[in-house]
Amino acid sequence: MDFNLTREQELVRQMVREFAENEVKPIAAEIDETERFPMENVKKMGQYGMMGIPFSKEYGGAGGDVLSYIIAVEELSKVCGTTGVILSAHTSLCASLINEHGTEEQKQKYLVPLAKGEKIGAYGLTEPNAGTDSGAQQTVAVLEGDHYVINGSKIFITNGGVADTFVIFAMTDRTKGTKGISAFIIEKGFKGFSIGKVEQKLGIRASSTTELVFEDMIVPVENMIGKEGKGFPIAMKTLDGGRIGIAAQALGIAEGAFNEARAYMKERKQFGRSLDKFQGLAWMMADMDVAIESARYLVYKAAYLKQAGLPYTVDAARAKLHAANVAMDVTTKAVQLFGGYGYTKDYPVERMMRDAKITEIYEGTSEVQKLVISGKIFR
């Protein structure tokens, strides 16, 4: 078993790490404070090929693998959880769905500009009364000639206010439950489509999280992904991949907080010696280190399995569950190690702790991941 990264994967890490340190980190606190979407950096990410890492060059991508993409999310999240999830939602949820389930025409029209970073992607599944219970969709699509008319809404949509291309789900047959759900590609300029409420959040404050509103929205029939009534399996498979992205975000946030705590402990002195010389505090860091490394192996394994075309649903659930737990634990301990300073905005660990919380919630709560894992244990 080879645990070494390939030369290409190491180069991706180096490139993204330099970008994160030079471009993302300097504005991370400011965009969090002002809730400003970092469009300038997202455009640069497109220019550097980050928005299409796992997609073939034929479709405008970088021709990399899933682990290279996961490493990119991890490195960005070390300094800014917001930027990490912008990339994750764009790649794992929107572009990857089109890449895996779209027609050749859909790939050429929508995947190519997404992979090149010319367009930003988003994914719309969650509704006011359909969170974990995705089958309780109320959004309805009715076929009328050469188009569908869609009415309804989606909430908590990452990249919602800035995306150009969305994949959404709607009921085409309300009598069939989940077997009546279909998937559609929509564009921000479609008639009847508008952005509703813009959410104000505890963490990842610079990401655009919004409501999507559909009022007699016209969607061409050729924009359906897959067959009518086959949207639910597509949604669930896509979330499996998305969970690896969120696990990578959680891993990166934990690593970022760990790095900040380590640096602080070396410079901060109490009772005539630096904090790293206090055994109790040093052992806290040892526990954090072990937790981070165990999360890394779960995340990387899930990415490897996805790339290899092997079953990865349970591994993605394990990775997300554990990495999210680690992110909350490590960031909380980092704040504690900083003492009173950790509770202020003078240091980034309070932001990292706020950013970490959402990793236990979106793309399947920690409780949902336990359902997936326990289902395998007892089947």
Swiss-Prot record:
GO terms for biological process: butyrate metabolic process. GO terms for molecular function: flavin adenine dinucleotide binding; short-chain fatty acyl-CoA dehydrogenase activity. It comes from the Bacteria. Pathway: Lipid metabolism; butanoate metabolism. InterPro entries: Acyl-CoA_DH_CS, Acyl-CoA_Oxase/DH_mid-dom, Acyl-CoA_Oxase/DH_mid-dom_sf, AcylCo_DH-like_C, AcylCo_DH/oxidase_C, AcylCoA_DH/ox_N, AcylCoA_DH/ox_N_sf, AcylCoA_DH/oxidase_NM_dom_sf. It catalyses: butanoyl-CoA + oxidized [electron-transfer flavoprotein] + H(+) = (2E)-butenoyl-CoA + reduced [electron-transfer flavoprotein]; a short-chain 2,3-saturated fatty acyl-CoA + oxidized [electron-transfer flavoprotein] + H(+) = a short-chain (2E)-enoyl-CoA + reduced [electron-transfer flavoprotein]. CDD domains: SCAD_SBCAD. Its cofactor is FAD. The keyword Acyltransferase does not apply. Disulfide bonds: none annotated. Keywords: FAD, Flavoprotein, Oxidoreductase. The keyword Cell membrane does not apply. Its EC number is 1.3.8.1. Belongs to the acyl-CoA dehydrogenase family. This is Acyl-CoA dehydrogenase, short-chain specific. It comes from Clostridium acetobutylicum (strain ATCC 824 / DSM 792 / JCM 1419 / IAM 19013 / LMG 5710 / NBRC 13948 / NRRL B-527 / VKM B-1787 / 2291 / W). The lineage of its organism: Bacteria, Bacillati, Bacillota, Clostridia, Eubacteriales.
